[in-house]
Amino acid sequence: MGPSAVADGGGDRRLHVLYVAWGFPPSRSGGVYRALATVNAFAAAGFRVTVLTAARETFERYTGADPSLESQVRPEVTVVRIPFEWPALETDLRRWSALRMFAPDRWRERQRRRDVSSFPEVGYGPWRAPLEEAALAVHARSPVDLAVASANPSVDFTAADVLNRRHGVPYVMDYRDAWMLDVFDGGLMHPEGGRVDRLEKDLLGRAREVWFVNEPIRDWHARRHPDVAARMHVVANGFDPEFAPRPRLAPPDGSRPLTFGYIGTLSRKVPLHEFTQGWATARSTHPDLGLARAEVWGHLGYFSIPSSAMLRLVESHAGDGLTYHGPVPKTELRDVYDRFDALLLLLGAGRYVTSGKVFEYAATGLPIVSLHDPVNAAADVLRGYPLWFPVTGLSTEEISDALGAAAAAARRADAGTREACAAFAEQYRRDLQLRPRLQALADLPGRRTSTGAPVGEHA
């Protein structure tokens, strides 16, 4: 029996979930796959789902889009799109004010103050008003039983907040990253006791559940908010079976050079320079890497235009067999993975850093070279994977040795070892990660009152 609720005006008795995510298809951001999978999982479990997200133009103009993802949203899901303005990324000079033209520093400071006036998030703060208005409009048309807001940006939480304050709608905070915690250095992103800190404490205190992508981030928040700890859960990203690469259970053709591959977004936190040095050394010293290729697929930086510095670095190593191939639609990922004999996992440093691609990588059954800080949370995921080759440091020699070991495994690992890799990955299917939470939310006693929830003051 699926989740049920009182009938709406059209007679539909299913629980109505409002899912809020700035980045939803056709966005190409890393978090879009979590949003897509979560929405589809709610719909498949019998919930009636409405999504609040930004207009398509937002992604087409500013961050890049993957149009193929829209076809993957289940047809019964209703998607409501809200215009989003991003002045700082506006490149059309005809839309620039005179102040921006002739006093850009003054314009940036004024824009920053405007951004955070209603919500403390540069670039995204102004979206609060249209987001809240849209959430209330959805609720007026068909009462919402549960709101699930996925951040970042954290302004997404405001839609759930306004429904809870005015109508008593319970909500889930789904942290794809963190708000106060700097996941790279473990410090604070915002001042203790400041506006963000107060706002987060208030929102956490009223949340029905709080989801985090890994145990280190959940533990950090549980220690900081012990009264909310029992409602905090890990919902790992996992891999999506419908997009997952096909496990490779046979070694590559011994007559051709090996191909190593990376798929994802390379940020400035990733040790790309260290990798290129290690790759060049490994290719000249390890026999299994003779004439080997390394392909980078995805985005160089977070925006639609590739980072010129990263692109120059990759192109400067063309003679070492390193090439950049650009973004790949999610629906074509399997074909790209089929090109590879081993995988490169490049991540930024930090105990709290994880990655969605690590689960997808594991599903391939291929050797995986972890080129990141050994204490990175991704190491917790891969520990026990039979063909995992982590570095102990990021020196040229350590990277070269790990690449050489992975190349030898790519050539000689037997079918049993590869099958064990694929079996290891099964635990990280995204539907298995989501199932316990959806089951827990299927029954929402006292979910909504006619008078609304107790209202506190915003920080």
PLM regions: where:
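N-terminal subdomain of nucleotide-sugar transferases
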Residues: M1-P87, E209, A282, H286, ...
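Conserved donor-binding/catalytic core segment of Leloir-type glycosyltransferases
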Residues: L18, P252-V270, T276-W279
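Membrane-proximal helix-turn-helix segments that form the acceptor-binding/catalytic region
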Residues: A37, S118, V122, E133-L136, ...
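A conserved catalytic-core segment of Leloir-type glycosyltransferases
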Residues: T53-A129, H139
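Acidic donor-binding loop of glycosyltransferase active sites
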Residues: R208, G319, T323, Y337-Y352, ...
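Carbohydrate-associated surface elements
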Residues: P216, G238
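Nucleotide-activated donor-binding/catalytic signature segment of Leloir-type glycosyltransferases, i.e.
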Residues: E295-L300, I305-E332
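A charged, aromatic-enriched C-terminal amphipathic alpha-helix characteristic of glycosyltransferases
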Residues: L394-S400, R411-A442
